[in-house]
Structures are given as C-alpha cells and as structure tokens.
Design a protein with these regions (language model features):
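Short glycine-/small-residue motifs
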Residues: 121-124
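Conserved active-site tyrosine of GNAT-family acetyltransferases
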Residues: 16-21, 91, 119
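Conserved beta-strand-loop-alpha-helix junction that forms the acyl-donor binding cleft
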Residues: 10-12, 106
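Helix N-cap motif at beta-to-alpha junctions
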Residues: 12-13, 82-84
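Vicinal oxygen chelate
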Residues: 1-5, 27-80, 86-115, 126-130
Length: 130
C-alpha cells in the first residue's frame, strides 16, 4: 500500500486551487468542469480539493467543514521548504491568516502555521534532519 492523495473539502474548489497556487507555488493539475473537484501537483503526493456537496454525498452523517470552524480542525497539511520565513510571508500576502510566526524548535526545525481562507491549517517547515 502507498499513500495516494489528500482531499480537502472546501466551499469553493476553484478558489482554493487558486489560493494554493498563489500562496505556495503549486501547479494545478486539473479542475473538473463541474467545479466540484480539482488537484494540485505538489511533487510527491497529490493534494486534492472537493466541494462540500461531494462530502455530503460520500458521508451520510455529514462532516465538519473547516471553513465553518472558528478554530482549526485537528489536522494539518505540512509543506517543507528551506525558507520558512519567505514561504510564510508569501502565504500571508496571498490571504492566509497567521496562526504562528516562524519559530526555531529545540530539534532544529523552523516551523510556522497559517490558516487558509478555506479553513485549511498549513504548517510550513524546514526538513527534519535526524
């Protein structure tokens, strides 16, 4: 088995794709003509976005929308970069909300957190060397 992709359910798939392209520099793989599903090429693993209506169709009991939660959900997407400060500034300039400015952790990693307009929590971090 291998990890295939991550799907984030969002209110506006096209808007999320555009934000992630602008904020993090990922390339759009495609946006379905229905505007309810799209993917970004992140290098190793596909990052996909799907409309809340698809989540409603997939999960009969409903789901918690990250965009509707005042606090971030208990999961994050992490992007590894050599320059966390620059990536953090780029994300903020694109419209992200700062959750935590870049900080050096005791194990030597630099980490920051932003929340995207669609509610997604993103960690920006340097590689872990161990």
């Amino acid at each position: 088995m291998k990890f295939g992709y991550t799907i984030i359910y969002v209110p506006d798939v096209a808007a999320s794709l555009s934000f992630f392209e602008q904020a993090f520099g990922f390339a759009r793989r495609f946006l379905h003509e229905s505007q309810t599903y799209g993917e970004l090429d992140t290098g190793e693993t596909t990052l996909a976005f799907a409309a809340h209506e698809l989540a409603d169709a997939n999960f009969g009991g409903g789901h918690v929308a990250a965009s509707a939660s005042a606090e971030p959900l208990g999961m994050e997407v992490a992007f590894v970069t050599d320059d966390v400060a620059a990536a953090h500034a780029r994300a903020l300039a694109a419209g992200a909300t700062e959750m935590s400015a870049p900080v050096s952790k005791p194990w030597g990693q630099v980490v920051s957190y932003v929340r995207c307009p669609d509610g997604t929590l993103v960690e920006l971090c340097t590689p872990v060397h161990g």
